[in-house]
C-alpha cells in the first residue's frame, strides 16, 4: 500500500519569483481540446500510468474543479503541463496545483516551473491568495521546483514530518552535488 502524498502550501501569491528563461521555440499557452492526445502521452510518461484523451478530458474538466490547463509546446508538440484547480470545500481561498508533468526528454529545462508559475499567476488573477499541492516523496526535482517557487512543506501527520525530513535532506544533498559538479 502506498503512502498518501505529501502536502505543500504557498502562503502568498503576491510575490512570485520571475519566470525561468526558456528557449524561444517553446511556447507557454492554455491547452485546447486538440492537445488531449499529446497530454495523454505526456502524462503516461510522467506518471507511469495509462492515460488516453478521454481520461484527460474527464480529469481536466470544469466539473472536476479544473479552471485551466497550461502547456509548454515545442516544435515536437506538448512537452510540459500543469493545471489550475479549485477545491473550495477542502482548500478555501487556495488554488490547487494539479498534475504538473514534463516529458522525460525535456527534464532539466525548468519547464515544470514555467507551467507551475503560470498556474500560480492564474490563481492570483482569480483573487486567490494561496496555493496548495500534493506530491510524492520520490519526486525530488519537483519538490526542488516547488521550494524555489516559495512552497513550504505542511506535514499533516507525524509520519509526514519524518518523510519531509528525509525528502528535504535528499533535496539538499542533490543540490550540493549539482553546485559542486
Each model region followed by its residue ranges:
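Conserved acetyl-CoA-binding loop of GNAT-fold acetyltransferases
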Residues: 1, 147-156
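Acyl-donor-binding surface of acyltransferase catalytic domains
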Residues: 1-24
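A short beta-loop-alpha structural element at the N-terminal edge
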Residues: 27-39
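Hydrophobic adenine-recognition pocket in adenosine-nucleotide-binding enzymes
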Residues: 31, 100-102, 135
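A conserved beta-strand-loop-helix scaffold within acyl/acetyltransferase catalytic domains
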Residues: 47-101
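Conserved acetyl-CoA-binding loop-helix of GNAT-fold acetyltransferases
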Residues: 102, 108-125, 144-148
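Conserved GNAT acetyl-CoA-binding A-motif
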Residues: 123-135
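Conserved beta-strand-loop-alpha-helix junction that forms the acyl-donor binding cleft
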Residues: 133-143, 159-169
Amino acid at each position: 500500500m502506498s503512502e498518501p502524498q505529501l502536502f505543500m502550501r504557498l502562503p502568498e501569491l503576491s510575490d512570485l519569483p520571475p519566470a525561468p528563461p526558456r528557449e524561444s521555440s517553446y511556447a507557454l499557452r492554455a491547452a485546447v481540446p486538440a492537445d488531449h492526445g499529446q497530454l495523454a502521452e505526456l502524462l503516461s510518461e510522467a506518471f507511469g500510468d495509462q492515460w488516453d484523451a478521454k481520461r484527460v478530458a474527464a480529469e481536466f474538466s470544469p466539473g472536476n474543479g479544473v479552471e485551466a490547463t497550461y502547456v509548454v509546446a515545442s516544435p515536437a508538440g506538448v512537452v510540459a503541463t500543469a493545471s489550475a484547480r479549485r477545491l473550495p470545500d477542502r482548500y478555501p481561498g487556495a488554488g490547487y496545483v494539479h498534475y504538473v508533468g514534463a516529458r522525460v526528454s525535456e527534464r532539466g529545462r525548468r519547464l515544470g516551473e514555467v507551467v507551475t508559475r503560470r498556474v500560480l499567476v492564474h490563481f492570483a488573477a482569480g483573487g486567490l491568495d494561496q496555493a496548495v499541492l500534493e506530491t510524492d516523496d520520490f519526486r525530488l526535482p519537483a519538490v526542488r521546483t516547488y521550494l524555489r517557487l516559495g512552497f513550504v512543506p505542511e506535514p499533516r501527520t507525524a509520519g509526514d514530518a519524518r518523510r519531509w525530513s528525509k525528502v528535504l535532506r535528499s533535496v539538499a544533498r542533490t543540490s550540493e552535488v549539482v553546485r559542486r559538479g
